[in-house]
């Protein structure tokens, strides 16, 4: 069992139970999955960019990235249906906790001028989304081997019913929110 999962079970669950006033431990919010998504608009001109991006996302997540394809053709963007336009990874279970631990303890502190993540990234149902501008904050990415600095989105899906429950859960898990 990963250290963060153990911490969640032993520390976060009792704290959330008291804080939110739940009686049943199954009512307590938990993290269900983490989705990493990298959309590449420049892949329209150069489809080979997607392969490199998928490789980088695979290194960051520790799980193979899936290439996403365009659902519709859009003439103004010179986009055809079925063209590769990005990649994504969905993490669950052990890998999800390992990634969250790496994000909070290693990657986020390496962001330039980091003062905490925005508390406005909640969607109304307790899920949190944030953007990473540079993939080089992760230790798996070698700065000399990348062709271009790319950003990606991280969505943390929780079983929380409200934003406040989701915020409490993530704060207890170590997510550094801005004051």
UniProtKB/Swiss-Prot annotation:
Disulfide bonds: none annotated. SUPFAM superfamilies: RL5-like. One of its GO terms (biological process) is translation. The keyword rRNA-binding applies. GO terms for molecular function: rRNA binding; structural constituent of ribosome; tRNA binding. It comes from the Bacteria. Keywords: Ribonucleoprotein, Ribosomal protein, RNA-binding, rRNA-binding, tRNA-binding. GO terms for cellular component: ribonucleoprotein complex; ribosome. The keyword Thylakoid does not apply. This is one of the proteins that bind and probably mediate the attachment of the 5S RNA into the large ribosomal subunit, where it forms part of the central protuberance. In the 70S ribosome it contacts protein S13 of the 30S subunit (bridge B1b), connecting the 2 subunits; this bridge is implicated in subunit movement. Contacts the P site tRNA; the 5S rRNA and some of its associated proteins might help stabilize positioning of ribosome-bound tRNAs. Belongs to the universal ribosomal protein uL5 family. Part of the 50S ribosomal subunit; part of the 5S rRNA/L5/L18/L25 subcomplex. Contacts the 5S rRNA and the P site tRNA. Forms a bridge to the 30S subunit in the 70S ribosome. This is Large ribosomal subunit protein uL5. It comes from Desulfotalea psychrophila (strain LSv54 / DSM 12343). The gene is rplE.
């Amino acid at each position: 069992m990963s250290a963060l999962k153990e911490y969640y079970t032993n520390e976060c669950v009792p704290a959330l139970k008291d804080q939110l006033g739940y009686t049943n431990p199954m009512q307590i919010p938990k993290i269900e999955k983490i989705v990493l998504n990298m959309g590449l608009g420049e892949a329209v001109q150069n489809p080979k960019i997607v392969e490199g991006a998928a490789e980088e996302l695979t290194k960051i997540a520790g799980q193979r990235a899936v290439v996403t394809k365009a659902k519709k053709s859009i003439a103004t963007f010179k986009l055809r249906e079925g063209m590769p336009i990005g990649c994504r990874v969905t993490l669950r279970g052990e890998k999800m906790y390992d990634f969250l631990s790496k994000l909070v303890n290693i990657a986020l502190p390496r962001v330039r001028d980091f003062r905490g993540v925005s508390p406005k990234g909640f969607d109304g149902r307790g899920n949190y989304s944030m953007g990473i501008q540079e993939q080089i904050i992760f230790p798996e990415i070698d700065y000399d081997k990348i062709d271009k600095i790319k950003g990606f989105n991280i969505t943390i899906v929780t079983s929380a019913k409200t934003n406040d429950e989701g915020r409490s859960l993530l704060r207890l898990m170590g997510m550094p929110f801005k004051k």
